[in-house]
Amino acid sequence: MYKRQVKDILIRYKNLKRIYGYKIDTYWSNISTAEAYYKTNMDFLKPEIRNYFFKQEPTIKTKIDDLPPAKYNPGAQVKNSLVASGCIINGTVENSVLFKDVFVGNNCVIKNSVILNNVYLGDNTHIENCIVESRDTIRANSYYCGDGEVKIVVEKNDRYIL
């Protein structure tokens, strides 16, 4: 679909505008949909992609927040995941990407998910195949699972009501 959209734009504007292209032989991803955003984040769990961007001099620059390193409390289990600074892990995290300042409660299970920044996951929560929106509070004993497609979780956030 994306290829068709690009062709449509090029054909429409080829006589009206100067159009230039740049050949990319390295990793590239179009993140115009939630599914593509999810897939791109999951790609960073593959060593060859992660190493391309972070092994030598990082090619991705981010804002520095001076947060402490991630904290893994007793009982925490993390497998094949990227965990950013400021995170506190008390449960199980597998094949997931956790952005900065994520709190994972006791007995939580996070699998194949992208958890954006400033998210609180209450005790006994199960999140699988999901993208959890920034600044969310997922209450204890919650269950979210994307079956066959990515599920986007947006909860009402009582922590930030003015």
Per-segment meaning from a language model:
Residues K3-L162:
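Left-handed beta-helix
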